[in-house]
Amino acid sequence: MPLCSLENRHLALTVSSSGGTILQLSARRSGGDFPLLRPAMLSDETPAAQSACFPLVPFGNRLKGNTFSFEGKTYRLSPNTADAHYLHGDGWLAEWDCIFQGTESLTLAFEHHSDSYCYRAEQRFLLAGDRLEVTMTVTNLADYALPFGLGWHPFFPLTASARLQAVASGYWQEEAQCVAGKHHQNLPADLDFCTSQPLPRRWVNNGFSGWNGSADIVWPDAGQQLRLTTQPACPVYFLFMSDTRFDPGYQHDFFCIEPMTHAANDHHLPGGGSLTVLSPGAHLTQQMSLQCIALCGDEHA
């Protein structure tokens, strides 16, 4: 199952076993489908970084120094891309197996074994009316406990009128090499999305604290809204806006809001921050829901 497409009267979804990624999620409309996620090339060779959404497992973002200590032992992780850091976990770079496929749902799984993390991850994709529900479970296969976290890295279309609403009470300053640094309580004006605001057109790569696990993205010019919710409510989201220095081919056509069960670099906080310690055989489950909503009075719906 390199690619699998699911659809109902509201949504069309394409998933790839390469990286466990979403390549397409569109709202089905009589006037033409609207991409709720950045459209990607529908190929099993599409890399996760060019997909519409990829999973973060066994934790997300970067780990400062590529090392952490837990229960008296130091673990070292090797960079897994051209980035200097072990980035976004293993799932987005792995080949997943399809272990179930139905008319409106499918489940992918893969296992990872290393000198540090050994685990099994599953993602279940379900079209439930006007919502896509993605449920990810990670199970610790090692014979020792380790801290785990989950999340997703979705790419959303950035249009001239796109707006974002996502509650936050603080954010982490970005340090050299894109590593999360000092936490600040006061949000910059152009990064305060407690009320609906347009997206800044500049480099942004920050985690936000005090989130309630819900966000709304509105594309007024298209008469479309997307509601992102998480269960349990994720306490952190990451906002990413690229630029042409980082990506010379960037067309200012997408942004990312990444729900995470933990903050970046939580391994270095006392108690592991919001990471979840999993004993051998224990598991952690997280759900992300993406709901398409037509704006009232929209003639395109």
Q: Positions of the model-derived regions?
A:
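Extended, loop-rich substrate-binding clefts of extracytoplasmic carbohydrate-active enzymes
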Residues: 7, 73, 78-129
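Acidic-aromatic substrate-binding/catalytic surfaces of carbohydrate-active enzymes
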Residues: 14-74, 80
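Short, hydrophobic/aromatic-enriched beta-strand segments in well-ordered soluble domains
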Residues: 15, 108-110, 125, 228, ...
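Short Pro-Gly-centered flexible turn/kink motifs
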Residues: 68-76, 136, 276-294
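Active-site/ligand-binding surface loops and adjacent short beta/alpha elements
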Residues: 76, 155-233, 300
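Acidic/His-leaning functional-site neighborhoods
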Residues: 85-99, 163-164, 199-273
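Acidic, contiguous internal or C-terminal segments within carbohydrate-active enzymes
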Residues: 110-158
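Beta-strand-rich interaction surfaces with strong enrichment in secreted/lumenal proteins
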Residues: 122-124, 273-278
